[in-house]
From Swiss-Prot:
Residues 1-89, 156-400, 507-549, 586-613, 650-951, 1024-1048, 1087-1152, 1168-1199, 1216-1250 are annotated as: Disordered. Residues 107-147 form the UBA domain. GO terms for cellular component: cytoplasm; nucleus. This is Protein lingerer. It comes from Aedes aegypti. Residues 227-258, 287-300 have a biased composition (Basic and acidic residues).
Amino acid sequence: MSTQTRSGGGGGGRNKSKASKENKENAGMDEQPQPQLQQQKGNATVNSGGGEKQKKGIDNSGSKGGDSKDKQHQQTTTHTIKTKQPTAEQIRIAQITDIKSGMDDPKIQEKIQKLMETTQRSEEEVCCALQECDNDLDRAVIFLLETLPVGAFATTSKKKKNKSQNKEQNDSATGDGDWDNGGNVGSGSGGGGGLSADSKDRRGNRPGNQRSGGGPGGPGSRGGRGGFRDGERGGDRDRNGFDRGGRGPRGRDGRDGGPGRGSYGGGSRGGRGGGPRVGTRGPGMRESNRAPRITDHQEIDVWDSVATPSANDLNKPEESSAFADTWGDWDNEEYTGSLSDTKVFTPSTQVAATTPPAQQQQQQPTSSSTQSQPTSQPQQPTTPQPVQSQIAPVQPATVSSSVTSLEQQILNPLQPKETDLVQQYSTTVVSSTATAAAAATVQYPDLHSAPSAAQHLRQALEMPQINNSSSSLSAEQSQYFNTLSSQNSNLQSSVVNSYQQSSVQYPTSYGSSSTYSDQVTSSQQAPTARRQRARVPPPSKIPSSAVEMPGDSLNNIGYLDVQFGGLDFGTDDTFDSVPVTDKFNTNSLEQSTPSSVQLPSAVQPTQSEVNDYQSKPSVVNNLQQKSSLTSSLQSTQILPGQSDALTATQSDSLSNSYSQRNTSTVVPSSVSSGVNVNSINSTTSTLEQLTKTDPYSQSTGTNAGSGGYQNVSYSTSQANKTSSYPSSAAPQGYNNSSYSSTQVSTNTYPASSNNYSSYNQSGVNSYQQPSSNVSSSVVPNNNSTSSVGVSTVNQSNPNLPVNNNVSNNSSSNTNTGYLSSQYPVSQTSSAFPSQQSYQNSSQNVYGNTGLNSNTGYSGSTSTSSGQYSNFSSSKLKDTPVSTQFDSVSSSTVSNNNSANNNSVSSSSSSLPNSSVVSTTSMSSPSLGLTNTKVTNSTAKSSSSSGTGVVPNIPMVSPYIQPGVPFYQQPLYSYEDLQMLQQRMSHVPGYYDMNYQTPTSLGAAGVRDANLGSVAYSTMSDGRFTRTDNNSSPVSNVPSTMSQQTGSGGPMLNLPYAYFYGGNVMPGGFQYGTPAVYPPQPMATNATSGGQFQKPAYNSGYGTSGYDTLSQSGQDYNKNPYPSSGVGQQSKGQTVSNQQSAGGSGSDIAPSMYGKSHVALNKVNSYEKQSFHSGTPPPYNIAGTQTAGATSGQPYGQHLYIPQIPTHHNINMHQAMHQDSNSSGQRPQSNSQGKTATKQGYSPSYWTGQN
């Protein structure tokens, strides 16, 4: 199905005969299928000639010819065929193929998705299988698993698909032909065989032979396969920087197994055509041989026809050397190709392609902008074809029939058409307003073109039941579409006219496939959307926008399906009132316009009138809804991911609401669909999507039948549902959609209902009372239709004065009366609007976006009013039915827009401007819509970007903010990877405390100077010195305690951040730490030194004792750890204390070890004996000497020792220390020996550490 695009392109690309190539190039991809057929069939010689030329020495030219063709083809297929326009013939073929394949049929898409999931095959293969098996899933599965080789399309998956479809279509015109029909030398060989061969070639020798198949097709194959390959491989060529085109030639030469192979290796770059040359290369060798390839030509034909022989070969080659290349090509090309060529199969563009080629051309550019168009309709021979299939006049009936059931159910087709016409007009009108112009251009295209695709995407995402794309597209994909849609919307403005024409062309069909009608209009854009879809295929790999994707998946699916405000929901969080208002207004407008009331009488006339844009009700309905959608789309486009998905769902969800939904769903794609849905169906469809209930869909279908009027009555029931639904979807309700739906409901709801509804809406809106007010401002639009009136009432109700009006309005029947009431109501709204303004301001408050929109929209509103007036007059003139109502509406609208709307702009601030614009556009259903479009667009843009984006950003911000604070924690955490900050207190803190401890211990005064400065030495000596000092201060001297506490605590913080890693790697950070601590220890040392020990230790430590360090050092050196630990300690105990001062410098390390024990022993003896049990905590946290000092000393030891082997022992000892606790093995007795109490405990403790 998706293969067609590929095959068309592929075939054309590969017809290598130069003449053929030129023809193709000239004809463009459009004519490629025929040239292939001709060349393959009639021009067999030419093909071989072409192939031969390539082989013969025109390898480059052949190859290049293929390449140039390929490149073009590649661009067209892999990229969006930017430069090629489908010919009428191609379009027809595409239409036929698409219709045949039912590519747009949601059911087909679902099948494709299921098959892809079940068989884990590529979409191309799955589509091929479905095509072969008449869309029978079971047969297709069997076919895929048993008949179709795994790598059948590996090299040329995308195009191959095309081939099969083309062939199946007898579109052998695509050189590729069906891979199954590969036997078909003309198309099959060239294309089909080539195809098979292609995959084979990639895979292995046979592929080359298979290519031979291409060989006979040589030209054809070249055209088809080569084209395919060039398309697919062409990318590789480009990637590789050499003409992989050779590959194309390889396909073209087909005969040259080698070349084909070569192409594999890439060695055949350039040589593909010159099979011999390439053949010589490894690739040729790799392939069977050129000769085998030539021999295989026939085989290829046979294989293609039989598929199996080659399949076997293919399988071998796949696994063989070629296989890797195949993967490379397959991955890059397939991956990209999948995106661009045929990943998403959605009915979005399935609308009968009545759009003339000119429109297609417009589409083409659109698709050019979005490269996924060809992809979107992979089945079509060429990218243009997909457009054609969308555009084919025959399509409407067929597509309509197949999709109509779904689409009608989802969207009421009649009005969308009207909408298109209206949109046309409104586009013009909107153009008058700057905001409108931008919105209209973007909106309309979005509504039609992107929406068709995007809408389907969204529907698929949000209403998988209804949408074909539901299974196909992921949230990311939908986002991607949205992005594309957004991009396309500008391009699509040009398309709008043609779209409108299209929609006018087949109103009836339109009714059946209103969605498609829009899509027809949108078909131009749909291709774009489709292309986008094509891009969609790699959902996870290539998110269009990473940020938006989450919104789509979460918001769209989560909110969209359930609530209109999927997009708005986030907005709601952020006080999404702006999008809501925008949506609300738009929807309100649209709902009111959904004008089931007007539509009933005007709908069909409107369709005819739609062209005139005169049947305001329908037109307005469509326009308004569409405009709203468009506006919402445009705005929402800003949040394409969420908006798109939401829009699709929302659009579908509400038809009257739909406008709202569309509005709220700012997704352009959705919009097109939404627009259709917007029409009366929209409410039903919208509700349907919202509730996602078939009954709604059915109702929608019914609505489609009723043309728009039922929409009202359905709207009524739907509205009721919708109202309640929107209420449940308060955010959405908050969003225009819900509210709008409610408004529509309001219409639906009787007067009291209306009042209540309005309050419901208010309730729904309650965020949205302003929203309701916005609705009020929209009300004028609502005034246009009874629904509008009701909406107005609803809004009015939210508006203070409107209650009576609401009652009147509540009968949506009283359009004129309602308008009259509404006009006052609007005035009330106007009066109220300040209130609304206020409320909306509240909403606006969500995001000043709303207010800004308001302000911006005030101008817009005024402009809207101006336009409105114009619209009103125009509308009044145009529609008698509308006229009375509209005239009132127009006047009301104008006034409302001016005052109320402006008020509303402010008042319905959520998207007050949106509201205002919306209102304005609402006031005249037809014109109002345009205004709505404009206003909504602007408002929506603000609201969407502001509200939608802002909510996201705040979401991010909070994360970031915590992140920033926690960034330090990550510092801690980072260092705390080993230890959390909390833990840092413990183990690392334990070490950290060591730092602290050294600080507080501060290496005894002398040491502090030396060791303090030298972290390493200092830490070592510091340990000893500090330990002694610390222990005494802890037990005896508060100064030490304070030092420990102060230095330890503060230092701990730094150490955590700075030194935790250092703790682990003390050496690095440690030095800094000691330096930090020692200054503090300087003071503390004095106190600790003097106070610390029982005078003997202190004095010994301070000077005489430690001077002995050299002695200890000797011992230490002589006796590494054990000596220092045991023997040294004893010596160290006595001597170290005495010598410590003298030997502090160099002796510290050795004596430090033993003496640390001694000194530490003393320290520990006081505090640590009891404290040492808790040693681990003390290291970190212990407030007293143990925490600071002990910890510090061991840490210091670590710092010092890491260089010295004993350090390791020390580490062990630390553990042991903990284990040993008071009874340090060696230090204990030794330290005691020196200073019984002090040393005794301390040594044991420190020994444990040391």
